[in-house]
Amino acid sequence: MIGDQTLCSVDERTVRFGRIFAAVKKILILNGPNLNLLGKREPTIYGNRSFVDYLKTIEAQFPDVQLHYFQSNHEGELIDKIHEHGFDFDGIVINAGAYTHTSIAIADALGAVTTPAVEVHISNVHARESYRHHSYLSPKCKGVIVGLGLTGYELAVRYLISDE
């Protein structure tokens, strides 16, 4: 009982005054090494906008979604976040940066959890250096979005909150 409202849990939904509200979706957005420099780093490739600024746009587009953002330049910290939220969130949007092409450990972490993930890259990694063409993460993800700039994050969130 909250005030004069009676709440009870029914199949992960909340009943309030006889109406059913769907549970709030929770999405984790993970950015890897050097992505803290968006807006400053190689603007011809990554653009002029910081990710923190762009995150406000995503939050405005999805007001009913809890977006949790985490960036780290350290592989173990990214793995810890996947472990922390990989069983109770509705989706993970991951741009592991250069770890995409080197980290079996992050791939194993994605494979060990039940939360679906979408891999995102701001630039078209297939049009860049050959060592960027292979992803260890892709086989562990529901999909991959590359080369669409920051919009790729929005598309990933949209997919993960859909019922597909």
Regions found by a protein language model. Give the residues of each.
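Short acidic/histidine-rich motifs immediately flanking catalytic phosphotransfer sites
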Residues: 85-92
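Short Gly/Thr/Asp-enriched flexible loops that form oxyanion-binding sites at enzyme active sites
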Residues: 103-113
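Glycine- and acidic-residue-enriched helix-capping/strand-helix junction motifs
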Residues: 37-52
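Short beta->alpha junction loops
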Residues: 68-76
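Short, glycine-/small-residue-rich phosphate/pyrophosphate-handling segment
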Residues: 127-164
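Extreme N-terminal starter segment of soluble prokaryotic enzymes
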Residues: 24-27
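Short, acidic/small-residue loops that bind anionic groups at enzyme active sites
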Residues: 112-128
